[in-house]
């Protein structure tokens, strides 16, 4: 059985070296789901490091620069809408997390994931290094209490926001730069007026309502 998620992980209980993992964009109607993995050094100076959702955009960008500078290693994983529709958002999120871990300069002996789910066996196996798999733990609220997970949440969010700004310049009329792909009233009105574009998740309710869309909403 997978390890039970924890609500808090006291510092004494943390492995000595681990990668914190978090995602951004899971609930959006458009754009990719992005995950980040971060290994922080034993000592670092990143005052105000916390869950990215509690920070202003300017503060996130400032912290992201500091994280990239001081991290032992960090990585980003991206899965685009076509694959999200094909394998579902839960599996796409797992895939993005695995991709983020695989691009780290050193394989982590352990990974701590924000939320209540760990990587399934078929995804975890892809992270094997010299026959060894990282241990893993899911920590509910980890982005607010584990600095490496907080750092991952910030890198994932800032990276994805910049991607959505770029997509806004390519796909006019949807307001991606403003709402970042979330299902705001403005975004839903744009979909109704123009129809979905190549960056929309066609299996999500609000983009193209159908039975599969309802299924997507129950997978996390």
From Swiss-Prot:
Gene designation: rnhB
Official protein name in the record: Ribonuclease HII
GO biological process: DNA replication, removal of RNA primer; mismatch repair
Keywords: Cytoplasm, Endonuclease, Hydrolase, Manganese, Metal-binding, Nuclease
Source organism, top-level taxon: Bacteria
Known EC number: 3.1.26.4
Keyword Cytoplasm assigned: yes
Stated family: Belongs to the RNase HII family.
Function in brief: Endonuclease that specifically degrades the RNA of RNA-DNA hybrids.
UniProt GO MF annotations: manganese ion binding; RNA binding; RNA-DNA hybrid ribonuclease activity
SUPFAM superfamilies given in the database record: Ribonuclease H-like
UniProt xrefs under PANTHER family: RIBONUCLEASE H2 SUBUNIT A, RIBONUCLEASE HII
Cofactor-binding details, from the entry: Manganese or magnesium. Binds 1 divalent metal ion per monomer in the absence of substrate. May bind a second metal ion after substrate binding.
Subcellular location: Cytoplasm
InterPro entries (alphabetical): RNase_HII (IPR022898), RNase_HII/HIII (IPR001352), RNase_HII/HIII_dom (IPR024567), RNaseH-like_sf (IPR012337), RNaseH_sf (IPR036397)
Domain RNase H type-2: 16-216
Pfam families given in the database record: RNase_HII
Reactions performed catalytically: Endonucleolytic cleavage to 5'-phosphomonoester
Positions that bind a divalent metal cation: 22-23, 114
